[in-house]
Regions:
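AAA+ P-loop NTPase domains with strong preference for DNA replication initiators
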Residues: 1-85, 89-123
Length: 123
C-alpha cells in the first residue's frame, strides 16, 4: 500500500513538473511541442497552471511574499510583472478553460486555449 501511494505521488509530481515546464516555455514565448492535456490529466494540470499564475501575480512587485509553488519561486520572479486588468483577465480565461474541461471539448483544445491565453515575456 505504501509503495502504491508513493508511486501515485511520484506520478503526480511528474505531471506537475511537466505542466510547469510547459507553462514556463509558453510564457517565455516558445510553442511547446509536447502537451500535458489528456482527459486524465486535465483537471490537475489546470490547477497547476492556476497556482503558478496566482503565484506569478503575487510575486509581481512584492518581495518576500510567500508563494505556494516555492520550487518555482526563482523562475516566477524572473517573469515580467503581471498585475491589474491583465491578471484579472488571465484568471477569467483560466476559469473558462476549467469550465470547458468539464464538457466534451477535447483536452488538447483546452490546453491550446490556455497556452494562447498566457501572456508572454514581452509586455
Amino acid at each position: 500500500m505504501t509503495r502504491a501511494v508513493a508511486a501515485l505521488g511520484g506520478e503526480e509530481e511528474s505531471l506537475r513538473a511537466h505542466v510547469a515546464r510547459w507553462f514556463f516555455e509558453s510564457v517565455e514565448g516558445a510553442s511547446p511541442q509536447d502537451t500535458w492535456a489528456t482527459r486524465e490529466t486535465l483537471d490537475d494540470g489546470l490547477e497547476t497552471i492556476k497556482t503558478l499564475v496566482r503565484d506569478w501575480i503575487v510575486a509581481s512587485g512584492h518581495d518576500g511574499v510567500a508563494l505556494v509553488s516555492l520550487d518555482y519561486a526563482e523562475r516566477l520572479g524572473r517573469l515580467r510583472s503581471l498585475e491589474g486588468r491583465e491578471a484579472i483577465a488571465l484568471l477569467g480565461k483560466l476559469d473558462e478553460a476549467q469550465r470547458l474541461a468539464r464538457t466534451n471539448v477535447s483536452p488538447a483544445l483546452v490546453g491550446e486555449l490556455v497556452r494562447m491565453a498566457l501572456p508572454t515575456m514581452s509586455p
